[in-house]
Amino acid sequence: KKITMGQAVQKLQNYCLDKGQQEGMRYAETVLQKYPNCFEVVYHSAHIYALSMDAKCMPRAVELYERALELIDQNEEDQINASTIQNGIAQCYCCMNRTDDAIEILKKNNFEGKNNYRIGLLLSRDKKKTKEALQYLSDALCRSYGELYNICIGYANAYGHMKDVNRVRDIVLWLQKTGSELRKPDVVNWMDRGDVGLFTILAETDISQRNEQGAYQWLLRAKESAEKFDAAPCYRLDAGMKFYHNDDKATSYDDMGETAKEIIEKIMKDSSEEKALRRIWKKVCEETGGKEKV
């Protein structure tokens, strides 16, 4: 039966999803004979071989991935690029117990530190490379938390648009608890600045449900965290982190304002509950001291 290129690609993708590797590999070899210069056919065929996790199949996977790199200009899928293909080759090398080769590829292909967790994991398997592993893992942990923070804020924004206040509260509370487990107690650091935003969002959720006492307590915590951070600003990633082992002096940053207290102002200004939040914020400032306006 004649099969089009599009049908062949779809069937290869289905084999990847269904994990039908043996049948998938046989099918891949058939369509590769017909479409040897089609990027999608070559790439998804390589992926089928790689998914087998069988060391004997990895050389063929690598061969096909390398061929896919030669055809990369045909690629139209946003989630696939030269970096993802190189990572695929590295994974194949891991299955072949060629760990050093895998690490070398991952290091060369480590744009914005995206492979730090992969490199750290592989290095951690060798006792002699523990120090280097911890350096990569430390950087990966900080990057992952930063990404997680922004992901959760994105969720909170989306749930806010949906008027799903309970989910906003749940995900922000979970994020704040997760962050608190990663830091040393009583050490002021960049996570205090992050908490200012989280506490202010939680105040917003309470005020939207007419829980003014709850909103007061969250704004009080936001104020305390902001004043603590602004008194001794520290953006260094290594400050106060439980599991940080890197020697560099990397720093965190955001676009929420010059001071932590400005974060409270920015969130209130953008809130649909601005009037009520400002009334309670004024009360917090009057009762605890400090300026209402930033």
Residue ranges of model-derived segments:
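Residue at a conserved register position within TPR or TPR-like alpha-solenoid repeats
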Residues: Y15, Y49-S52, Y93, L123, ...
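Alpha-helical segment of the N-proximal tetratricopeptide repeat
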Residues: G6-E40, H44-K56, G88
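Short coil/turn linking the two alpha-helices of tandem helical-hairpin repeats
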Residues: A46, A50-A55, E76, S124-K128, ...
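Generic helix N-cap/helix-start motif at coil->alpha-helix transitions
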Residues: I3-V9, N37-V42, E77-Q86, N109-R118, ...
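TPR/TPR-like (Sel1-like) alpha-helical repeat modules
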Residues: L64-E70, N110-E112, C142, R169-S180, ...
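Helix-turn-helix repeat elements of alpha-solenoid scaffolds
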Residues: N14-R26, M53-R67, A90-D100, L123-Q135, ...
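"A position-specific structural signal for the A-helix of alpha-solenoid helical repeats
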Residues: Q10, H44-I48, G88, R118, ...
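Flexible helix-coil transition and linker loops at the boundaries of alpha-helical arrays
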Residues: A28-F39, R67-A82, E104-K107, D139-Y149, ...
